[in-house]
């Protein structure tokens, strides 16, 4: 239990450093590690490393809800956590300027046991300016998030805690959010219900700002022999000893407020995506891959390999994929959401 006022002040200091640090990535990693450490110490939920980390996953009709343990472990991905915190901070700052003196409402769907992306910002924005609703499908995560908020002295910043499936949640008419926050995704928007959640919630709060602002998936031909053995974040720039060789094939799919609104009339289990053409590869070692780029808000971007969310995934839907063929994509909704490629004759 955290009772020491000095620890709470240290948490505030670390939050400000996480939002502003612009130097060596190793220092940022240390800042986030300390920040998450305080969250973990404040939480009722503790990671049991003797158990399968997938214990507690929920396979819903809209995608996989990862376990509380997995959600807690995700907080330690320093670049991911920092870029989401910075994007949400800027989105809130803009909303406060527009709504003042009324408080800004933030709905955090899929909070995990630490409410990692909300609690630090509760130390930056007073409850008179920003109120959070913390929602998760796992009762243990909500109980833990509540303990974190309480032990850090931030109870007044939370308007409500909700145990609910975000894909089925009905937003109260007197609590329409100004910002919708969800980070319930994996590479290329596979498996997890980010698309379904944002589509469902934005339909009820059509004027809300969404965080992340954009999740874009692009296709590239990749020379796998020239990809690094050790994954290097794109934002660091490639070392001089290797240069990736990637041929752009074009955009495939984007999740943002505009595309979500364009899907309003669609009622089936698929969403439209783009087609790409496969050119003749310079060498047999080239294979088509999907790349994910996440804009949390404004200038705050997760690029290739910055986190597990922006790893690359090979397109394996089509056997014997040859030059000159075209692939038509669509996004499949349901229990196993993902981008699906079909060969065009």
Where are these regions (language model features)?
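Conserved class I S-adenosyl-L-methionine
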Residues: 100-114
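Short, charged beta-turn/beta-strand-edge "cap" motif at the junction between a beta-strand
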Residues: 331-337
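Phosphate/oxyanion-binding active-site loops and adjacent basic polyanion-contact surfaces
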Residues: 73-85, 110-117, 137-141, 190
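Class I SAM-binding transferase module
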Residues: 2-11, 15, 19-39, 52-61, ...
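Conserved SAM-binding loop of SAM-dependent methyltransferases across substrates and taxa
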Residues: 112-128
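Class I SAM-dependent methyltransferase Rossmann-like catalytic core
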Residues: 57-96
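Conserved SAM-binding loop
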Residues: 145-146
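Conserved hydrophobic residues forming the short capping helix/wall of the S-adenosyl-L-methionine
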Residues: 149
């Amino acid at each position: 239990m955290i009772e020491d006022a000095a620890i709470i002040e240290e948490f505030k200091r670390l939050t400000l450093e996480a939002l502003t640090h612009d130097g060596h990535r190793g220092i940022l990693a240390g800042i986030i590690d300390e920040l998450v450490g305080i969250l973990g110490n404040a939480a009722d939920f503790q990671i049991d490393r003797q158990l399968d980390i997938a214990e507690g996953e929920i396979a819903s009709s809209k995608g996989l809800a990862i376990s509380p343990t997995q959600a807690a472990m995700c907080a330690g991905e320093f670049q991911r956590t920092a870029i989401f915190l910075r994007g949400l901070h800027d989105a809130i700052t803009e909303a406060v300027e527009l709504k003042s003196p009324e408080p800004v409402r933030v709905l955090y769907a899929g909070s995990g046991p630490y409410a990692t992306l909300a609690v630090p910002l509760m130390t930056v924005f007073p409850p008179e300016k920003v109120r959070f609703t913390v929602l998760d499908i796992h009762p243990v995560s909500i109980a833990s998030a509540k303990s974190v908020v309480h032990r850090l002295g931030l109870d007044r910043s939370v308007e409500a805690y909700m145990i609910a499936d975000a894909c089925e949640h009905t937003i109260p008419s007197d609590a329409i959010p100004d910002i919708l926050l969800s980070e319930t995704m994996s590479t290329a928007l596979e498996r997890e219900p980010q698309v379904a959640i944002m589509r469902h919630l934005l339909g009820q709060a059509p004027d809300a700002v969404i965080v992340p602002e954009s999740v874009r998936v692009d296709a590239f031909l990749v020379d796998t022999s020239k990809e690094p053995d050790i994954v290097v974040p794109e934002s660091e720039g490639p070392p001089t000893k290797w240069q990736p060789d990637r041929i752009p094939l074009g955009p495939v799919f984007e999740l943002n407020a505009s595309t979500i609104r364009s899907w309003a009339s669609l009622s089936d289990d698929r969403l439209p995506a783009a087609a790409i053409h496969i050119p003749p590869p310079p060498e047999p070692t080239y294979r088509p891959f999907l790349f994910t780029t996440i804009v949390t808000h404004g200038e705050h971007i997760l690029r290739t390999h910055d986190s597990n969310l922006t790893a690359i995934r090979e397109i394996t839907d089509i056997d014997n994929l040859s030059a000159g063929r075209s692939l038509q994509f669509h996004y499949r909704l349901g229990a196993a959401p993902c981008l699906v490629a079909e060969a065009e004759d």
